[in-house]
UniProtKB/Swiss-Prot annotation:
Tagged with keyword rRNA-binding: no
Alphabetical list of HAMAP family matching this protein: ATP_synth_alpha_bact (MF_01346)
Xref: Gene3D superfamilies: 2.40.30.20, ATP synthase alpha/beta chain, C-terminal domain (1.20.150.20), P-loop containing nucleotide triphosphate hydrolases (3.40.50.300)
Functional summary from the UniProt entry: Produces ATP from ADP in the presence of a proton gradient across the membrane. The alpha chain is a regulatory subunit.
Protein name as annotated: ATP synthase subunit alpha 2
Topological category with respect to the lipid bilayer: Peripheral membrane protein
Organism: Cereibacter sphaeroides (strain ATCC 17023 / DSM 158 / JCM 6121 / CCUG 31486 / LMG 2827 / NBRC 12203 / NCIMB 8253 / ATH 2.4.1.)
Residues with site note (Required for activity): S360
Gene Ontology CC annotation, any one: plasma membrane
Binding site for ATP: G167, E168, R169, A170, T171, G172, K173, T174
EC number assigned by the record: 7.1.2.2
Length: 497
């Protein structure tokens, strides 16, 4: 009998059965206020651990005190009160990840908000994960093409970069990010849009825009609206980043938009004050910089040894009265790899996108730009900045010098070229053709009001030119014959009805 394989297997299974006592650590709610619970009696609790209340509601351990634990509620509708039993789960908070999230609208825990069946995850990842180390990263050298001429030509965003979009309320910050998502409809980049504390109607508009433009199937929407509990709003960017990291860690490419981190900082302050943490500048707790640094550092371009995937971040921040030197904006600017600043004055002047050329910058820039675009975009920013300065001084008197008048006229054309309606992306070949024509003076006699029609007509003309097929597929070099063909296309587009 001792040699019976079935008996040996049974013995092995019996040996794995734990025979000792099962120990559960429980506590009780001491106080409950505004989505934060103070629990007594969980001495072994860990930061980030999930606890379960009587009735099934869950919470997240945020702070540890000598006698109590502060827990953020993740189920705001739960019926809880003083004395309710709380149990440790021993597990850190995790979220579902996988292809099943594509084209779905979920809350930060991965629960559907779109009325469709539950997500079937391929795995689960903890919401707090370490950022890739230095040796695990690669240089940011591939572009994320947004389809916006002002961004792709002047402030190029690379795969693995963190480019902050910052400006006053209602100046087109979300529109910039949504345009970048829409332009990925036919690319290999998976997009994640994270709504933190936004109005439900605003989130619905974003979702419908992405759906109408054909990018919905490759986008994941993680929504924690203003009506969600503070705990859900707090975990939203971390949970969505873990979902996006699953794509990156398998060699894929992801783009994540945080809309917005100013509201995330506000909910962090709210929870910290409820937990009686010492307030610092503007009543934010002392770890506010670390909060966003550890979040944004998770966006990276991985080395080939680690799969070569990338996670690009477009965090959004709101400022008041144009004050870029406020606490949260300066924190985010110092963490990110550059910023795109939207201007209320430009927005009021009907300039779309309302990007302030002088205050915006990309610390990666040309390193991640297509070679052909880099070749023709070199002087555009300088010329436009000089035009804005001369335009300001021209209010005090006319310019008699013909050369100065020509520079003013050129600057006006640059501004008209950079103007772009929402969700009308321009391909890289079209951008190269426009900037090459500008550099050659081929647009100097085009009336400003006709430039919008020219941009719309140029795409089909380029697509119909068979000689530009290789360039359309890989616009990395601008050979003389290619430049000539592009200029010929611009001339044909000018003549188009």
């Amino acid at each position: 009998m001792s040699g019976d394989p079935g008996l040996e297997a049974l013995k092995a299974r019996v040996a794995e059965v734990p025979l000792g006592p099962e120990i559960e650590e429980t506590g009780r709610i001491a106080t409950l206020a505004d989505g934060l619970v103070e629990v007594e009696g969980l001495p072994g609790a860990r930061l980030g651990e999930v606890v379960r209340f009587a009735g099934g509601a869950e919470g997240l351990v945020l702070t540890l005190d000598p006698e109590t634990v502060q827990v953020a509620l993740l189920d705001p509708g739960a019926a809880l009160g003083s004395g309710t039993e709380v149990r440790r789960t021993g597990q850190l908070l995790s979220v579902p990840v996988g292809q099943g999230l594509l084209g779905r609208v979920v809350d930060p825990l991965g629960r559907p908000l779109d009325g469709l069946p539950a997500i079937l995850p391929e795995a689960r990842l903890e919401i707090e994960r370490p950022a890739p180390g230095i040796v695990d990263r690669d240089m940011v050298a591939e572009p994320v093409e947004t389809g916006l001429l002002v961004v792709d030509a002047l402030f190029a965003v690379g795969r693995g970069q963190r480019e902050l979009i910052i400006g006053e309320r209602a100046t087109g910050k979300t529109s910039l990010a949504v345009d970048a998502i829409v332009n990925q409809a036919a690319s290999d980049i998976v997009c994640f849009y994270v709504a933190i504390g936004q109005r439900t109607t605003a989130v619905r508009r974003v979702i419908e825009t992405v759906r109408e433009k054909g990018a919905f199937a490759r986008t994941v929407f993680v929504v924690a609206p203003a009506t969600a509990s503070p705990g859900l709003r707090w975990i939203a960017p971390f949970a969505a980043t873990s979902m996006a990291e699953w794509v990156r860690d398998r060699g894929g490419h992801a783009l994540i938009v945080y809309d917005d981190l100013t509201k995330h900082a506000a909910v962090h302050r709210e929870l910290a004050l409820l937990a009686r943490q010492p307030p610092g500048r503007e009543a934010y707790p002392g770890d506010i910089f670390y909060l966003h640094a550890r979040l944004l550092e998770r966006s990276a371009k991985l080395s080939a040894v680690n799969g070569g995937g990338s996670l690009t971040a477009l965090p959004i921040a709101e400022i008041e009265a144009g004050n870029l030197s406020a606490y949260i904006p300066t924190n985010l600017i110092s963490i990110a790899d550059g910023q795109i600043v939207t201007s209320a004055a430009l927005f009021a002047a009907n300039q779309r996108p309302a990007v302030d050329i002088g205050l915006s910058v990309s610390r990666v820039g040309g390193k991640a730009q297509r070679g052909a675009l880099k070749a023709v975009a070199g002087r555009v920013r300088l010329d436009y900045a000089q035009y804005l300065e001369m335009k300001m001084f021209s209010r005090f008197g006319g310019f008699g010098d013909a050369a100065l008048r020509a520079r003013l006229a050129r600057g006006e054309r640059i501004g008209a070229l950079l103007a772009q309606p929402r969700t009308t992306p321009l391909s890289t070949p079209v951008q190269v053709a426009l900037l090459a024509a500008l550099a050659e003076g081929a647009l100097d006699d085009v009336p400003l009001e006709d430039l919008a029609r020219l941009k719309a007509a140029l795409g089909p003309v380029l697509a119909a030119d068979a000689s530009l097929g290789p360039f359309r597929a890989a616009p990395d070099r601008l050979e003389p014959e290619t430049r000539a063909a592009l200029l010929a296309c611009v001339r044909r587009a000018r003549e188009a009805p």
